[in-house]
């Protein structure tokens, strides 16, 4: 068995060494704590006894075979689903009973496996949608276009352009979101999530559909986001090269249960992980 591998269409292939993540102080209080989290659908345990801690500036990976429960975990964290049992702490604050909107205000933002932009709106307006959870004017002031409204709109424009410039997208501000190339749409969705000022950013298969060049750019951008904004990032991804290169901690799910946690090297050499992806091999097999 090779000491390092990535999973690629059911085969173990050599994985190049040289991860790009530096040693980091992950902070005293975790950004996220999941404690015995679970949810059942009609008696089926989609996620069972899920516990995980993510440091304040950690890039963490959540991996597993298709149907393992990864996106369900994201839906629990963002309150699309309310857990059947367990606790979620964001920066030490219990999110129990909170709505999708409330946990976003608390500091959890996400992107989706399938891009969900407002295609007929401009790039800038897509980003400003995320800024509206920070509105400081009333509906009355907005309807009458009072000075408070214009002050906020000016600040929102400046913030949107600042965020777009970080990803070299400011020149696209007036373009329709739906007209952008695929990779740029992915970046825009991440920028919009960042506009909500999150403490934890959840990325659901951010490299899906990307070519190798776009994936390499994405990897650099994820590290850039962590270093620029000082936030925690948790990602679901099937591109194991991406995961193994940038994630400090990796959690592996199978059939809704955690089967392994650890560093890239530990996960790559974990028998339970290999079996989950590739199936159990008889001792006599080569």
Label every model-predicted segment:
Residues 2-286:
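Glycine-rich phosphate-binding loops of nucleotide-dependent enzymes
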């Amino acid at each position: 068995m090779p000491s390092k591998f990535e999973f690629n269409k059911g085969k173990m292939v050599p994985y190049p060494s040289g991860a790009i993540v530096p040693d980091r102080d992950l902070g005293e209080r975790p950004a996220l704590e999941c404690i015995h989290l679970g949810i059942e659908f009609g008696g089926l345990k989609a996620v069972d006894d899920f516990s995980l801690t993510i440091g304040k500036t950690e890039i963490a990976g959540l991996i597993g075979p298709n149907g393992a429960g990864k996106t369900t975990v994201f839906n629990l964290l963002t309150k699309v689903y309310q857990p059947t049992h367990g606790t979620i702490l964001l920066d030490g604050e219990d999110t129990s009973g909170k709505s999708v909107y409330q946990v976003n205000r608390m500091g959890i933002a996400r992107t989706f496996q399938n891009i969900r932009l407002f295609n007929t709106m401009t790039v800038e307006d897509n980003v400003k949608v995320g800024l509206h959870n920070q509105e400081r004017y009333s509906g009355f002031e907005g309807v009458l276009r009072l000075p408070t409204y214009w002050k906020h709109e000016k600040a929102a424009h400046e913030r949107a352009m600042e965020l777009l410039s970080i990803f070299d997208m400011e020149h696209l501000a007036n373009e329709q979101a739906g007209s952008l190339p695929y990779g740029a749409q992915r970046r825009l969705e991440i920028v919009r999530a960042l506009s909500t000022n999150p403490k934890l950013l959840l990325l659901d298969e951010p490299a899906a559909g990307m070519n190798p060049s776009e994936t390499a750019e994405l990897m650099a951008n994820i590290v850039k986001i962590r270093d620029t904004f000082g936030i925690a990032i948790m990602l679901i991804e099937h591109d194991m090269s991406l995961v193994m290169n940038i994630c400090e901690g990796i959690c592996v799910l199978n059939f809704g249960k955690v089967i392994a946690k650890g560093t890239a090297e530990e996960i790559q050499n974990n028998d339970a992980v290999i079996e989950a992806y590739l199936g159990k091999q008889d001792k006599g097999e080569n």
